[in-house]
Amino acid sequence: MSNFDQSIKTLKILSADVKSIIESSAKVIQEVALCLNLNGKPLTNIACAGNYFDELAIGFLKSERIIASLDEIEKIEVEAEKNSVNIILKNKKKSSEIFVKNIASSGAHGKSVNTDLLLPLKVPVDFNIKAQVALELMEELLEKSLLHNETHGTHCSALVQQGKIVALREDIGRHNTIDMLGGYAIMQGKDLSEAIIITTGRISSEIVYKVWNLGIPAIISHSAP
C-alpha cells in the first residue's frame, strides 16, 4: 500500500546564496529501513520510502531468484507500522539455504551480478517501440512522478503494456521501483513478454538484471546509461 502524505515530511532548512542565509522550509521524502523476513527469519534490510512493502518484498525475492512465481508463496504478512514484511514460503527448507546482504543503498542487487544466472529471455520477433510513443510515455511518466515533483528526492519507473502505463512506482532507490513493479506484475499475474519499463533512473547492470529476470524485453530511461 502507498500513503502519499506520510511519505513526505516538511523540515526547516537554511537556504544560502552569495548574499544571505535565510530560514525556510522544504519538503523531503522519508527514508525507512524495510525488514524483509523469510519464513520468520531476517533476510535483509532495504532502505526505501515506505510504500508498497508487499510488492517490494516479492519483487526483490524474484530478482534474487529466491522465488520464480507467486505459487511458491504461502502467505504475505505486512506490518506497516513496524516497517516489516514476512514472506512465508511453501517450501520451509528453502530459507535455510539463503543469505542476502543488507541493502543500505536502496534495493541494489543482493549478490554480485553473474550473467550466467540470467534467465532465458525471448523477445518476440515483431516487438518494436515507436520513437514518438517512447517520448510520449516518458513525458507522462515525468508528469505523474508526484513524489519527485514535490520533493525532487525520488526515482520513478512505470510498467507499460500495449502502449499504456499500467502501474507507476516512486522510491528513493531506482532499484526499488523496479522491484515494486516486478512484485505488482507477479501479484497481478501479468504476462510481461511484450512489456516495457520506463524509468527516470540510470540503467545500471543491476537494473538490467532485475528487468531481464522479470522477462521484460525493453527499458527506456530518461537518464544516461
Segments from the language model and where they lie:
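Intrinsically disordered, low-complexity regions enriched in acidic/Ser/Thr/Pro/Gln residues
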Residues: M1-Q161, A167
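Histidine/lysine/aspartate-rich catalytic loop segments that bind and position anionic ligands
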Residues: K144-K190, I196
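Feature captures the catalytic cores and cofactor-binding loops of soluble hydro-lyases/lyases
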Residues: R174-P225
